[in-house]
């Protein structure tokens, strides 16, 4: 059986480590090949370094973090605050999807506290959608791939959407046993310590990740540390009930039965 692949597509170097890395580690333990792609270079995230220097620093940090996770690192495709939904970026991201052929795509939620996250989500969904369309040319050109792929959206920052509404996951992955490795990967992004404190009020980005991990764990009602996910609608991507994350992780992935019942009832 061919090795199955999963890719995390995030806006900035360190976003994957905040909300997705634990799930990647669990998939790797289950025998999957894992990939990391930060769409932007993160070259605006400093009060000290210029853009060119910061671009190099953050690329090196992202490579080190991917190595800690045991993931394939993919180079960034744009600069910071430059993630705009459009054909140039979509064609490049589609090429990555066609190369990786992921059964699982992890990405940001459709609504988050900053537009780079929202635009990255839109691009990831569209790149997955066009993966099997031969007449859509990727850059560089890659053959269309018609395999199934399922998209999972991570939890928004602070577990609230931009309108301050609380967001509850549709499923939780137990990351307790891999939490130390997740922290180690996030700690690779040393350049962000002072920046996140000054720009976003994070006293310590490591402690902030710890708090969110525990909060999602409490939301699960079962796990000490967890990452939460909402599964994207299936048309254009997979069979109706395809859920490869749950299939791969078994009891480490707890489905939110209340969330699923609400979907069946048509509740918001």
PLM region descriptions:
Residues 1-100, 130, 242-248, 259-265:
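Active-site rim/loop-helix segments in enzyme catalytic domains that contact anionic ligands
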